[in-house]
Amino acid sequence: MKLRTKAKALRGRLRVPGDKSISHRAVIFGAIAEGQTVIHGLLRGQDVLATIQAFRDLGVTIYESADSLIIEGRGFKGLKPAQKPLDMGNSGTSMRLLAGLLAAQDFSVQLFGDDSLSRRPMDRITIPLSLMGAELSGQGEKELPPLIVKGCQGLRPIHYQLPVASAQVKSAILLAALQTQGETVILEKELTRNHTEEMIEQFGGKLSVAGKQISIKGPQRLQGQTLQIPGDLSSAAFWLAAGLIVPGSDLVLENVGINPTRTGLLEVIEKMGGQLSYQAVDKDIQTATLKVSYSTLKGIEISGDLIPRLIDELPVIALLATQAQGTTYIRDAQELRVKETDRIQAVTDVLGQMGADIQATEDGMVIRGKTPLHGAAVSTCGDHRIGMMTAIAALLVEEGQVTLERAEAILTSYPDFFKDLERLWHD
């Protein structure tokens, strides 16, 4: 695919699609709650569609209305054995959260995915779930997919310290614990996104959170709800970056989720000197309208407990760093190596081929700016965030063409990405 280059300015207002993390969880909790759940603003990207289809295969009635998704919840005990293996597509969230949920059922199921997902480690969930008494088996030492889950209704509670900062692992344990007699305690290494904890309470469940410790007693019953999904900050990140680095740009992004466990990017933008302002802040539903303008940026260090709060935004932050004066250091981000692709290597390869002064390290990157970018032939590596980062980088290119292979990966989380780019384009 040939990407747009030589952007003069991006201007306008935009509503980004619904939050991917929250959309997954809304579907999951709607399916296991009792009664009807109505979801407005759901992301209809390929990852979330994989979660929806999985629950249909598990006997849950899910249908669309004009502007919402309606789920006829079956409760924890109402799921039915799937007649075939469940296809998770490219979605690590789907596989890990469903593994936790299905570990406590009374039937077995196989979860599989595409080539990218089949290279992602599942031992991080099989270890704690096995300690609870579940039987899960993958391929090799890292328990790579396909993953066989042999349900066990007699799971036992555990006290577990997460070895990695992972909301997916935490969520898998919580979904199993909701069906387990007794109290399960999870101690996080670093605070991670808390959408699962919030949704448990939203659906009438109970848990307690004290700093990095989460305690939950099971079994519990959940009740169907009506939900409004906020816009995805991880999708908004690409437009925020474009507004900051394309000269003459001025963008307003409406209804963006600003859950504090996800707003590391906004803090980084401010530290780099970006012109960012908040409008129409709604603290109850944690959304805001964000306004950005072209800015002179400076290099900074990004590390420590900030990393889990912006892990998905690090590719586009690396792009920002190529246009910042000075050196940016990204550290403690080794988790990037086990995403849809090795994002440290992919970001370094793509931006390096386009002329950036960027170096991969074991746990991050070193980027020296400011550098002009030029045309190149690159690939998404099957990773939606690499694809969108490249499309924004291409806007700065004045010489040569940028061609992007496997651009369809962007459909994973942002089906209308290129349509929205055209809406904001100003000659």
UniProtKB/Swiss-Prot annotation:
Q: What is its main location?
A: cytoplasm
Name the keywords, alphabetized.
Amino-acid biosynthesis, Aromatic amino acid biosynthesis, Cytoplasm, Transferase
GO cellular component term, pick one: cytoplasm
Positions contributing to phosphoenolpyruvate binding: K20, G92, R120, Q168, R343, R385
Residue positions annotated to bind 3-phosphoshikimate are K20, S21, R25, S166, Q168, D312, K339
The entry's localization annotation reads:
Cytoplasm
Q: According to its UniProt record, which residues of this chain constitute the active site?
A: D312
Q: How does it assemble?
A: Monomer.
Question: Can you say what this protein is called?
Answer: 3-phosphoshikimate 1-carboxyvinyltransferase
Which organism is this protein's natural source?
Answer: Streptococcus equi subsp. zooepidemicus (strain MGCS10565)
